[in-house]
């Protein structure tokens, strides 16, 4: 029901329990607000940021390549990177010719980081596929079999 940030996922049980308790408390508040007649939209402000949502994106191959290039950068949030790396992996499986790493990847993987002074300083090897990036940057997901 709740998205657990990778950093919390790999933390100790005490940290995970604290996070889940907070999420559950916020969700209970949301339910109480709805039960008093507050609209779902207004009550949603009480929900935890970690509440899972459904995201629908429609894009052309060119648009996907652009989003993947921006959102798989190591400076992005883990949640965004994991989602976009999984999307990229699925697109690559559908069309390797369109979504190969030399055509679709973080900018650092295609030659040069566009972040300038804000670069993470850890470029992704040019031959890595999205599944390789996921396995290296998020090994717990790989161990648990939760990669796409």
Model segments located where?
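Family-specific signature for flavin-dependent thymidylate synthase
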Residues: 1-148
């Amino acid at each position: 029901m709740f998205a657990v940030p990778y950093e919390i996922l790999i933390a100790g049980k005490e940290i995970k329990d604290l996070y889940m308790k907070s999420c559950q408390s916020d969700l209970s508040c949301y339910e109480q607000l709805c039960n008093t007649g507050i609209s779902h939209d207004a009550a949603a402000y009480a929900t935890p940021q970690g509440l899972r949502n459904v995201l629908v994106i429609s894009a052309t191959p060119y648009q996907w390549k652009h989003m993947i290039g921006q959102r798989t950068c190591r400076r992005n949030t883990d949640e965004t990177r994991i989602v976009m790396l999984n999307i990229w992996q699925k697109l690559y499986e559908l069309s390797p010719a369109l979504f190969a790493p030399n055509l679709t990847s973080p900018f650092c993987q295609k030659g040069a980081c566009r972040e300038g002074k804000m670069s993470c300083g850890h470029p992704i090897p040019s031959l890595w596929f999205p599944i390789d990036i996921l396995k290296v940057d998020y090994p717990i997901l790989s161990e648990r079999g939760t990669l796409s």
